[in-house]
Amino acid sequence: MADNMTTTQIEVGPGATNATINFEAGILECYERLSWQRALDYPGQDRLNRLKRKLESRIKTHNKSEPESKRMSLEERKAIGIKMMKVLLFMNPSAGVEGFEPDCMKNPSNSNCPNCNWADYPPTPGKYLDDIEEVPENVDDPTEIVLRDMNNKDARQKIKEEVNTQKEGKFRLTIKRDIRNVLSLRVLVNGTFLKHPNGDKSLSTLHRLNAYDQSGRLVAKLVATDDLTVEDEEDGHRILNSLFERFNEGHSKPIRAAETAVGVLSQFGQEHRLSPEEGDN
């Protein structure tokens, strides 16, 4: 990672995870009610579908780590999420979500409690969805693969060989490659490996793929969690497409960002993470 790049890793406990999932489920319920009333435009409908897929997958994963008695369905979480919204929006502004109340709620004897308002609890930088993993997080002993001036076949093989040496857990992959002798991009990838009983390893999650120019400026990013979304910045589509055209043998015409993502994920057997709906957008 370039010297001028820093990264902050945010640790969130299971209580906060439950609160976040429940709140997002409440947001989904609001989206669905708008949809029933035909009040959503096409981008809004797309966000509804993406949020629903993400929540269903995240809840399924989260429930595996919870005792059976604490596991909740999406519908149960929607109900809790709506209650959270009512608490946050319509009750005393100092009211907080259970387990995360402001100090004045935990200690009613606090003399400042009557004057408590949201201004006393400013947003915490870096804890919004758009801010998380803006730069892939630091990983101990990250793998760096240099693919400069390599042909497609050799590049594919080198990626597979290097990645297969990774241990179970998180990793970071840095790919450096010249594009048409004009632009040198650095691509950072975060992911998590799982080791199977038979000894095989697979990439269970691709958390984020970022592309930077020579000055370290973020020019494009692919975000892939439980579903895949494609976000472009400036001419990120064109640059990222150019980068991965080299990996698509026999592909003479420019490829779209969605197809690029499929090409990257296919190296790890993750084609299914791009839905047909997203492939059309």
From Swiss-Prot:
InterPro entries: NS1, uS15_NS1_RNA-bd_sf. Keywords: Host cytoplasm, Host nucleus, Host-virus interaction, Inhibition of host innate immune response by virus, Inhibition of host interferon signaling pathway by virus, Inhibition of host ISG15 by virus, Inhibition of host PKR by virus, Interferon antiviral system evasion, RNA-binding, Viral immunoevasion. GO terms for cellular component: host cell cytoplasm; host cell nucleus. Belongs to the influenza B viruses NS1 family. Homodimer. Interacts with and inhibits human G1P2 conjugation by UBE1L. HAMAP family: INFV_NS1. Binds and inhibits the conjugation of the ubiquitin-like G1P2/ISG15 protein to its target proteins. Since G1P2/ISG15 is an early antiviral protein, NS1 may inhibit the host antiviral response. Prevents EIF2AK2/PKR activation, either by binding double strand RNA or by interacting directly with EIF2AK2/PKR. Also binds poly(A) and U6 snRNA. This is Non-structural protein 1.
